[in-house]
Amino acid sequence: PMVLIRACDEKVVGVLRILSWPVPTSLATYDTAESLTSVDIPGRGRSHADMQAAFMQHQTTSVQDDTCWYSGAKFGRIAVSKDSRGQGCGRLLVEGAQAWVVQAVRQHASVPAEVHRLGIVFQLSSQIEVQSFYESLGFQVQGDSYMEEGHPHIWCKKSVLTDV
């Protein structure tokens, strides 16, 4: 996950989970609570490049004209602490996550010579009450609302183009 930490007191004020899309179907192994108390949290110590390479393993691609489209990412579990809302923290998280994915694709892209641009798709399931926030970041609503975890949600999608 991407974590936003306030500099003055090192308090976590927001989190965002970045998932490769489509979400991998292989079963993930999880550490037990006991193992987490005796060792560092999994993922710590991994290089930025290693995490991006792992993310890229699950990407699918298609070439349309001069653009290679990557399946991109699904953002999930986006949360900002109540006392930090309305201060731009959510925007920082989403824009930071998008930049991380774009950097991963640009650094690990393997594309044919006729490709001059990379396209990346971002998706998320938004609670209806914060739909306008995601629309302000360029996401577009896809389909009808649905219930998820007891709250009405809407699927949102955004496509980004970048040079190779």
Task: Indicate residue ranges for each PLM-predicted region.
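Acidic/histidine-enriched, beta-strand-rich ligand/metal-binding domains
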Residues: 83-86, 104-112, 131-136
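Conserved catalytic-core motifs of GNAT/GCN5-like acyltransferases
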Residues: 121-125, 135, 140-158
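Short coil/turn motifs at secondary-structure junctions
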Residues: 21-23, 83, 129-131, 161
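Conserved GNAT acetyl-CoA-binding A-motif
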Residues: 94, 101-127
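Eukaryotic N-terminal low-complexity, Ser/Thr- and Lys/Arg-rich leader segments
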Residues: 27-68, 103-112, 161-164
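Conserved beta-strand in the GNAT
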Residues: 3, 10-21, 29, 46, ...
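Conserved acetyl-CoA-binding loop-helix of GNAT-fold acetyltransferases
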Residues: 80, 86-102
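Short hydrophobic/aromatic beta-strand element in the GNAT-like acyltransferase core
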Residues: 1-5, 15, 77, 123, ...
